[in-house]
Amino acid sequence: MKEELDPNKKTILVVDDEKPIIDILVYNLKKEGYNTLEATDGEMGINVALEARPDLILLDVMLPKVDGLTVCNRVKQVYNVPILMISARDEEVDKIVGLELGADDYITKPFSVRELMARVKANLRKNDDENNAKEKKKDTKIVVGDLELDL
């Protein structure tokens, strides 16, 4: 049975091939008041992300079928969504590659659930602030008589 998403809540897609990790993340995200979607491989992650357009993606780097770095790159080409990479790979070069391919944040396994939830909130807040600034900028006009100035 597919769970209905509450349109008043942010939706987070969890993409990981380890079911225990998905279960922990989904439990904690729901406890924080988020809708959740799940994908267990990279191909499914791309499909769910592009179909459902979640507000944030938690994305493992090492995935079957399509790796997380490729998922990140493909999704970011279509729409701007905060992506938080989760990986057992903690080398600096891995973090840099993930961030350069479009990830907004990177956390290594094992991770603190409390830290991860704080990062989720921070990335959602940052994205909301950016969207609000774009919307405000789009609506800023000065009209004097017949003269209209877009700011």
Can you say where each PLM-predicted feature lies in the sequence?
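Short hydrophobic/Thr-rich beta-strand motif most characteristic of the beta2 strand and flanking loop
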Residues: G33-T40, V48
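Charged docking surfaces used in two-component/phosphorelay signaling
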Residues: D23-K31
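Short, Lys/Arg-enriched segments at the junction into DNA-binding effector domains
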Residues: N8-T11, A122-L151
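Active-site beta3 strand of CheY-like receiver
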Residues: A52-L58, L63
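The feature encodes the CheY-like receiver
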Residues: I22, P64, E91, K109
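Conserved phosphotransfer cores of two-component systems
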Residues: L50-A52, R74-V81, L101
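Acidic catalytic/metal-coordinating carboxylates
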Residues: D41-M44, D67-T70, V75, D94
